[in-house]
Amino acid sequence: MIYISHLTDDAQMKNILKETGAGLECIEFSVSDNLDRLDERLPRFEKRLKEMNVSQLTMHGPFLDLNPASYDSHVAKVTRLRFEQAYAAAGKLGADKLVLHTGFIYRVHLPEGWAGRTADFFNEFLEGKSGITVCLENVYDPGPRTMIEVKKRVQSSDFSLCLDIGHAHCNSDVPLDEWIEAFAPYTAHIHVHDNDKSWDYHQGLGKGTIDLGNVMPMLKASMPDASVTIECSDPGDILTTYRVLKDYGF
């Protein structure tokens, strides 16, 4: 299943969804102001979903200033609160997946103990929950190893990984094919966009320096059941990327 991140206005998104038949990845509740007003904002957004004729939905959760592996108990509590609010919103809207960032920033956070603390957080967070797959996404993570450690330590079958190929290409020295090979058994969701490695531009596939001829067949072969979200804001980039995905059998 292909989804498109809600990075354009509703009118453009409605037309794009009609043209492609794709689902929507909601970013509305990645914003703390909306999480603080769920009772007010959820009904409004449900109406907007109907107006856009959204048929399938995933959700991107909050990430700014949050860190599930934080040593600071108050930061950890706020992270838990925001993730709980996003999970509740995902349930009410009928989203099947909730994408959450690791919060790890290379050369800011120490890698020692990070996997254990993150796994402890998600084991507690997911206790008693089912029906929504939580997908942990790489952003500034330098390589796949520690995220795989987290996946192996989290007990819930509703916990998986989200491979963002644009982030891996831009923010890691590990080649993309090594990310794909390592993540393959653990990935339920993929984010696609392109860049030239100098900045996380979220361009359409083919506009940056990702080797599509190598990466796309490898993704399709090694993660055949993973859903995919196009994370571009320019309508032209969205449609170009959609066509690339279809050309490679997604």
Predicted regions and their residues:
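Charged helix-capping and loop-helix junction motifs
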Residues: 38-44, 75-84, 112-120, 148, ...
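Alpha-helix-loop-beta-strand connector modules within alpha/beta enzyme cores
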Residues: 45-59, 118-131, 212-218
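Active-site acidic/histidine proton-transfer and metal-coordination neighborhood
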Residues: 68-160
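Active-site beta-loop-alpha junctions enriched in small/polar residues
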Residues: 5-9, 27-31, 62-64, 103-105, ...
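Hydrophobic faces of well-ordered beta-strands that scaffold small-molecule active sites
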Residues: 2-6, 22-26, 57-60, 98-100, ...
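Histidine-acidic metal/acid-base catalytic patches
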Residues: 10-20, 96, 144-159, 169-250
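A short acidic, helix-capping loop that chelates divalent metal ions and anchors anionic groups
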Residues: 65-70, 104-110, 170-171, 198-203
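N-terminal pre-domain/capping segments
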Residues: 1-85
